[in-house]
Amino acid sequence: MAHKKGASSSRNGRDSNAQYLGVKKFGGEAVVAGNIIVRQRGTKFHPGENVGMGKDHTLFALKDGSVKFGVRRDRKVVDVIAA
């Protein structure tokens, strides 16, 4: 029975990159149109006024203004209050 593995037969030795998810702009912070507000998997936060959602559920500002987090119909919602 071999006491060493053959060349390049190691099964470990790989790792995935961090996903960098989470809230990027917090309540009260100023945002410019296009700024990412939340990066998420699924809709933990839903888009509200002046907020768009990308295909990976990223929320982003559609207008310049300040970020406001709230709850509407038992859903966490993110709004941008236009400046």
Swiss-Prot record:
Which BP terms from GO are recorded? translation
Record keyword Membrane present: no
Q: Which GO terms describe its molecular function?
A: structural constituent of ribosome
Q: Which cysteines are joined by disulfide bonds?
A: none
Question: What keywords appear on the UniProt entry?
Answer: Ribonucleoprotein, Ribosomal protein
The reply on keyword rRNA-binding is no
Domain of life where this protein originates:
Bacteria
Q: Which Pfam families match?
A: Ribosomal_L27
Q: Gene3D superfamilies in the record, alphabetically?
A: 2.40.50.100
GO CC annotations on file: cytosolic large ribosomal subunit
Sequence similarity: Belongs to the bacterial ribosomal protein bL27 family.
Name of the protein this chain belongs to: Large ribosomal subunit protein bL27
